[in-house]
Amino acid sequence: MAFRHQIVIIAQPVGKMKSPPGADCSKTRRFLQARGALAFAVKLRYNVGAKGGNGEMETRQTKQTSAGRRAALVLAALLLLALLLCALTMTRVYPAMPEALQVLERPADGVTVRRGAERIDFIPAHPQAGLAFYPGAMVQFEAYAPLMERLAVRGVLCVLLRMPGNLAVLNPDVADGVQADYPEITRWFLGGHSLGGAVAANYLEKHGGEYDGLLLLAAYSVADLSGEQLRVLTVYGSEDGLLERDRLESGRALLPADAEEVVLPGGCHACFGSYGAQPGDGVPTITRAQQQEQTADLAAAFCLENAA
């Protein structure tokens, strides 16, 4: 009886995501390409068959060939791992600014901050709507604390979600179960910044009936939500140097017909969060605080209107 080993390497794609939106993306592409190459599957199949009636032993040459294939497979895996580590080294993580971390220690009056291992909740005294938020790629998620606090002051309970490796694509279903923790809130929205917004939109392609709307900050959808019963608000700055305008344009056709879009005069890509400047972004003509205040006004009005 002979055993024949067949080793098949299958490259697995990262997912259905197209080029992620915004600035986080240029540095993230190397990571995603390396990750896609590394995420391979090895199938080892043992084919058992009788050859006549005398039992056939594997020849020395076959053994050597199998050993050579295994060695080549191990070498390929090591090379791919080295490529991934190199990509990670080249990818910068944007840390939260001190002002963002201070919000977590001393939130505004009427706002309670509840910190968990995988998320931070910003809870108003009388929440009227809920927002689960996906941060941008390679940004320390605490950097969005000032914006979340501003929304909570306006009556929107915000759940800021932590992403593994600071990449939403590595855990796109992180919003699962968020609503169950606050059963008293009956209207929920999903939002995200840049790549986080695109991943949030992808999530709603499968979970659209669970949310009332989508908030896209400097982001566009690559998922077809045109047939969903969702309200959508897109907000971006006039000086954003990282949001791909052609993708934004083509993404409009994927949104419901009544989707809203607002341009913040003088706003940039990075100032939705509090993590400093990003290479390639435009020069804002308004302050970070002003951009976040205007965004909070728009987002709160959007959520609370739909929660009425």
Model-predicted regions and their roles:
Residues 234-236:
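Short beta-strand/loop motif that positions the catalytic acidic residue
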Residues 210-219:
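A conserved short beta-strand
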Residues 147, 243-253:
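Short alpha-helix in the alpha/beta-hydrolase fold that links the catalytic acid
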Residues 251-308:
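C-terminal catalytic-base region of ester-bond hydrolases, centering on the histidine
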Residues 57-110:
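N-terminal membrane-anchoring alpha-helices
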Residues 148-168:
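Conserved alpha/beta-hydrolase
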Residues 192-200:
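Gly/Ala-rich beta-loop-alpha elbow adjacent to hydrolase catalytic centers
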Residues 128-136:
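Short beta-strand element of the alpha/beta-hydrolase
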